[in-house]
A protein has these predicted regions:
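Membrane-spanning alpha-helical segments of multipass transporters and channels
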Residues: 1-176
Length: 176
């Protein structure tokens, strides 16, 4: 009896395999640092009757631009400094763009709405996602609690999208 090996979606090295997890984590941590450094609430002294929506999105634009810049630097660093394997670099940049948009909006909204409590929630969510996002181990190997909650958080989806950009697309799984 002989076994045969049929490699599907091969990865050149361990660094390329772990890049999606650490890139997503870096984008999240960068957004957390943004809300820690910059004030989420704008001064309203010189504004004439601003609506809540104008106040929210007017200040969010700064967070959005900074988070996009950070995502670009992270992805460019992955590709050109770390030289990870990547079959679809353009799609990886697009994934970084949408991941950054999602994370920055979620983190900004929680911080804007709940202040320091929102920041604490963001950190707790980050810890739960690190432990149970299927970024380092398959979901099937995680404790029961993590298997139940991992689908509620954004990390697994962003990691899966980045994995597909790096290793190869699996049908229409990327757009689902």
């Amino acid at each position: 009896v002989q076994t045969s090996v049929n490699k599907v979606y091969t990865i050149d090295n361990y660094g390329s395999a772990m890049a999606p997890f650490y890139s997503v984590l870096a984008i999240w941590v960068g957004c957390v640092i943004l809300v820690a450094i910059l004030k989420p609430h704008a001064r309203t002294d010189n504004l004439i009757d601003p609506t809540r929506t104008e106040l929210f999105f007017g200040r969010y634009i700064l967070f959005f631009i900074m988070s996009q810049l950070q995502a670009f630097i992270i992805i460019a660093g992955d590709l050109y400094i770390l030289k990870i394997q990547c079959l679809h670099p353009g799609l990886l940049y697009l994934t970084g763009f949408f991941t950054s948009l999602t994370f920055s909006l979620l983190i900004y909204a929680l911080t804007y709405s709940f202040g320091d409590v929102g920041k604490a929630v963001v950190v707790i969510v980050m810890v739960l996602q690190i432990a149970g996002s299927s970024g380092t181990f398959p979901v099937e190997l995680l404790p029961e609690f993590n298997r139940r909650i991992y689908i509620l958080f954004p990390f697994p989806y962003a990691i899966d999208m980045m994995r597909e950009c790096i290793c190869g697309l699996y049908g229409t799984h990327y757009v689902q």
